Amino acid sequence: MADQVSSDEEVWSEREFVGHDFRDDDFSRLRTERSVFDECDFRGVDFTESEHVGSAFRNCRFDRATLHHSIFRQCSMLGSVFTDSRLRPLTLVDVDLTLAVLGGCDLRGVDLTGCRLREAGLVDTDLRKAVLRGADLSGARLQNIRLDEADLRGARTDATLWTTASLRGAKIDVDQALAYAAAHGLNIHGE
């Protein structure tokens, strides 16, 4: 059975919420540790300066939520949807965003090093100057994504990234440069 919400708590440890409606709640400065939120509604929730360690936010809605100055470490946001949310500045360390929908979000300059964004919806997302070193973008939907001046070195990507994204000034490694060339039909020879 899911725990009941108590507004006077600042640390939620090992709690579970399923299908809970948190709409317009104030979670600023809240800390969660190993807590699970399944199919919860966070529309309009203020997460300002909150910190989350080892918590899971699976298939949750974050419409008009405020997550700026928040920290997420070793968290899962599997299948969660972010619409019209204020997300930066934001700290994400080893976060699983597999199947998450971040389409149209402003993630300029956010450090997503090592994050998993497999099959994530990133259509029209602004990731200019973001750091995606070692991130996994396999199978992500990337139409009209903006990655100008982003650091993509070591990121796992599909060929669609190289043909659909805006990449002016992006930092890539040699293997990615070859993948970019191949995606654009270039025939590369050593001699």
Residue ranges of model-derived segments:
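Tandem repeat scaffolds
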Residues: 1-191
